[in-house]
């Protein structure tokens, strides 16, 4: 990777930046479809300029927080869902790098990308508990709408630089949709 300008105009060497530790959540309904939300684009974030805005819930792991706890916290903060049961935890962490034009800008300019631990859950509740805009607890809305999507469609709905992550996640959890 080559250097890129950060938010202050200084050159940023992506190799010198860490990955942000995060969790990702695949939530399946009883029909085997996956919950996906359409991201609200914030200027300067990693989705700025994207047209493929559908994604599964994800978010950062707080310092000292267990990834499984972070997954349930993020799911609630972004969707309001609490009626879920754990199906599976992916064995490996999956990394992605930001594209060059976002390096040093997105993710507050502090990270080269994310390293994600993925979890699959079954949604056991009533869809009336899903609340995205506004989400519960005074959290900022990240999605403007949501749908249940076929798992195989997910890689083509996400922003291109996260596509390989979604391909790996779908391959890992494909057997759960059957």
Swiss-Prot record:
PROSITE patterns: NUDIX, NUDIX_BOX. Keywords: Hydrolase. One of its GO terms (molecular function) is bis(5'-adenosyl)-pentaphosphatase activity. Residues 18-171 form the Nudix hydrolase domain. Its EC number is 3.6.1.-. A motif (Nudix box) lies at residues 59-80. GO terms for biological process: nucleoside phosphate metabolic process; ribose phosphate metabolic process. Coiled coil: none annotated. It comes from the Bacteria. Its cofactor is a divalent metal cation. InterPro entries: Nudix_hydrolase, NUDIX_hydrolase-like_dom_sf, NUDIX_hydrolase_CS, NUDIX_hydrolase_dom, RppH. It is an enzyme of class 3 (hydrolase). Accelerates the degradation of transcripts by removing pyrophosphate from the 5'-end of triphosphorylated RNA, leading to a more labile monophosphorylated state that can stimulate subsequent ribonuclease cleavage. Belongs to the Nudix hydrolase family. RppH subfamily. NCBIfam families: PRK00714.1-5 (NF001938). This is RNA pyrophosphohydrolase. It comes from Brucella abortus (strain 2308).
